[in-house]
């Protein structure tokens, strides 16, 4: 999976898909009450990027629904995964549950259209810190209460704050979440990062019987040398400001026979058995 990073303006969706991304990440900015308002990162952000691009969240969902609906004029077959980077660190943890309710209802109304939409992308909920786990509980409760538990099959979770992996496992146990879990490891493209935690996540992913990590990805990669180093470790995906660079690296002799781009037929919740 190649995730286009910080795709917050509607016009950026096609831009990143044209560069080769098959997944996009966008930031969800919430008001103090936990209501999702806009797709927006804000300052600071990655080096060399404009931090202020944005869209109304519901309008963004309306557009991305079309982009991921077969036979729609806007349909782009390659886009199979949407990563919602939830800026919960900007609000009180006490509002995390309210935020989970709101985001779930907005997805029901504007993306899935309560069963009337054929939009098919998988959804990855990126949670910054384990202290905000009530967002996940609320999201699942809302799908159940609204009568759409079936959409749980399309939704995975991911904690992005580089916290202790065992601590994350403990929270997943509390939530009863034993599948559909991704694990991110990374840092802004402005700085270098070692691979110790990334290797630990990959080791846990590959441990027989360990169900708390199905996929591992690294962020935010812009240098080809770092992309190569990361691919050699065996990650499932990378997040990048430059998907075209990732494509070029994947075509190199060292990687061409080991990796391919994920398609809709690849289940993002299953461990890859090479």
Curated annotation (Swiss-Prot):
Q: Where does the chain bind Mg(2+)?
A: 25, 27, 85
In this protein, the active site sits at: 5, 41
Enumerate the Gene3D superfamilies for this protein: Phosphatidylinositol (PI) phosphodiesterase (3.20.20.190)
- Give the reaction(s) catalysed: an N-(acyl)-sphingosylphosphocholine = an N-(acyl)-sphingosyl-1,3-cyclic phosphate + choline; an N-(acyl)-sphingosylphosphoethanolamine = an N-(acyl)-sphingosyl-1,3-cyclic phosphate + ethanolamine; a 1-acyl-sn-glycero-3-phosphocholine = a 1-acyl-sn-glycero-2,3-cyclic phosphate + choline; a 1-acyl-sn-glycero-3-phosphoethanolamine = a 1-acyl-sn-glycero-2,3-cyclic phosphate + ethanolamine
EC number of the protein: 4.6.1.-
Asked whether the UniProt record includes Lipid metabolism among its keywords, one would answer yes
Record GO terms (molecular function): lyase activity; metal ion binding; phosphoric diester hydrolase activity; toxin activity
Check the record and name the InterPro entries matching this protein.
PLC-like_Pdiesterase_TIM-brl
User: Which cysteine pairs make disulfide bonds?
Assistant: 45-51, 47-190
Which of UniProt's keywords are assigned here?
Cytolysis, Dermonecrotic toxin, Disulfide bond, Hemolysis, Lipid degradation, Lipid metabolism, Lyase, Magnesium, Metal-binding, Secreted, Toxin
Tissue specificity is: Expressed by the venom gland.
Q: Which cofactor does it need?
A: Mg(2+)
Q: Which GO terms describe its cellular component?
A: extracellular region
Principal subcellular localization: secreted
Q: Which SUPFAM superfamilies match?
A: PLC-like phosphodiesterases
Give me the comment on cofactor binding: Binds 1 Mg(2+) ion per subunit.
Please name the GO terms of the biological process aspect recorded for this protein, alphabetically: killing of cells of another organism; lipid catabolic process
Could you tell me where this protein is found in the cell? Secreted
Q: Which family does it belong to?
A: Belongs to the arthropod phospholipase D family. Class II subfamily.
Q: What does this protein do?
A: Dermonecrotic toxins cleave the phosphodiester linkage between the phosphate and headgroup of certain phospholipids (sphingolipid and lysolipid substrates), forming an alcohol (often choline) and a cyclic phosphate. This toxin acts on sphingomyelin (SM). It may also act on ceramide phosphoethanolamine (CPE), lysophosphatidylcholine (LPC) and lysophosphatidylethanolamine (LPE), but not on lysophosphatidylserine (LPS), and lysophosphatidylglycerol (LPG). It acts by transphosphatidylation, releasing exclusively cyclic phosphate products as second products.
Q: What is this protein called?
A: Dermonecrotic toxin SdSicTox-betaIIB1biv
From which source organism is this entry? Answer: Sicarius cf. damarensis (strain GJB-2008)
Source taxonomy? Eukaryota, Metazoa, Ecdysozoa, Arthropoda, Chelicerata
